[in-house]
Amino acid sequence: MPDRHVLGRRARASGRRAERATLWLMWLMGWDPVAENLKLGRFELDLLMTRGDELRALEVKSRRPGAWTTADTALTYEQRRRLQMALRSYLDQVPWPGRVTFQRVSFAGWRCRFHPPERWDGLKIPR
């Protein structure tokens, strides 16, 4: 069995492939990229995309097929809180006059699922 460093490298590579695939799929659906792996202090946003007056933050989760925790359930309350804070930090720096939404994208191998978008304030996470 590979050691944990090899497994970690494979997981990061899988995550990068999933993020790149998401970026291309969103672009094919008419979205324009704003930022990729945007670091805001200790927080990070995987993808920021725009279409018309809408800004969408995307969190991409990738798991190997048959993993114990699926990519669909991989977003914990703490992770959602960090994403909310990252998005707030971005909007403090770059005010956005239009709608702001959040969307999870899950990959298991090359199977992809786009979860329904949520209003960013709909995450209901206190400051």
Predicted segments, located by residue:
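Conserved catalytic cores of phosphodiester-cleaving nucleases, focusing on short active-site segments
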Residues: 26, 45-70, 83
